[in-house]
Amino acid sequence: MKVILDVNIILSALIRDSTTRKIILNSEFDFYFPELSLHKIRKYKDYILEKSGLSEEEYDKILAILFKYIQLVPTEEIEKNWDEAKKIMEHIDKEDVVFIATALSIEDSVIWSDDRHFEKQDKVKVLKTKEIANLS
């Protein structure tokens, strides 16, 4: 299964050695993340360090390990679906247009997110952590 990761899923995997991290590291899924959203992970680095108790070195190591299992989707691949994604999310959450555009760019993909607002759209299938865990 092709799975687009919402930024909060990656943050969760960084904060603790959780089900989320285990799924990313051990499942047979193909994981994707929009290159365009890497800044969001960097933006929360201090928060992650505080919550997790990780040193910067440990944080960098875990991030590098996670991204061995996550394929970055170049912005150019996402741009062709940006307008459609924007229409889908314009009255829901404009911050998440990038994840819808990424899913539209990767055939037969789903989004992994625990954010409820994704339920307000019906163009892209969205699975919660519990559902992903049951499939892995």
Which role fits each region the language model picked out?
Residues 1-35:
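Short, well-structured N-terminal submotif of metal-dependent ribonuclease cores
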Residues 26-28, 35-84:
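PIN-domain endoribonuclease scaffold, especially VapC-family toxins
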Residues 38, 104-136:
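Acidic, PIN/NYN-like endoribonuclease modules and their adjacent C-terminal/linker elements
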